[in-house]
Curated annotation (Swiss-Prot):
Signal peptide (residue range): none
Top-level taxonomy: Bacteria, Bacillati, Bacillota, Bacilli, Bacillales
Keyword Cell membrane annotated: yes
Protein's organism: Staphylococcus saprophyticus subsp. saprophyticus (strain ATCC 15305 / DSM 20229 / NCIMB 8711 / NCTC 7292 / S-41)
Keyword set, alphabetical order: Cell membrane, Membrane, Transmembrane, Transmembrane helix
Transmembrane regions listed in the UniProt entry: 1-21, 36-56, 68-88, 100-120
Pfam families for the chain: DUF1516
Membrane topology reported for the UniProt record: Multi-pass membrane protein
One Gene Ontology CC term in the entry: plasma membrane
Family to which this protein belongs: Belongs to the UPF0344 family.
Protein name per its UniProtKB record: UPF0344 protein SSP1805
Compartmental location: Cell membrane
Length: 129
């Protein structure tokens, strides 16, 4: 389930940038915007469901520590999904969205850093921490 979660958030980030840049402030939406936005929403659901599943598995396995970080990552993940949707919606309505775009990028990076240092993350597994 962890591999599906990682693959879905990688595709989610790619689709977010594709949707954001397929909507021009002057010309409006490109013909590809609506399908990309629908795929973006589908992958948002996949990320949330798989992330919640990983969260449940981690708590039920009784793994030593990391529960506070895992809960923080879950909150950051929900914030990323919410920020992505609000950013695309503001861009679609013609309102300024550059600040939200940068906020979304910062929260994405923060969420990825938390995910990397979690007990199931690559850094922890690589060094046996």
């Amino acid at each position: 389930m962890l591999h599906m979660h990682i693959a879905s958030w990688v595709l989610l980030i790619i689709l977010f940038f594709a949707a954001y840049f397929n909507f021009s402030e002057k010309q409006g939406a490109s013909p590809y915007f609506k399908p990309i936005h629908m795929l973006l929403r589908l992958f948002m659901l996949l990320v949330l469901i798989s992330g919640f599943w990983v969260w449940i598995q981690s708590f039920s396995s009784g793994a030593a520590g990391g529960h506070m970080l895992l809960t923080l990552k879950m909150i950051c993940g929900v914030a990323v999904v919410a920020l992505m949707e609000v950013t695309i919606t503001k861009r679609k309505k013609g309102q300024p969205s550059h600040g939200l775009m940068w906020t979304t990028i910062v929260v994405i990076i923060l969420t990825m850093i938390i995910g990397i240092i979690l007990p199931m993350g690559p850094i922890t597994q690589m060094f046996g921490l």
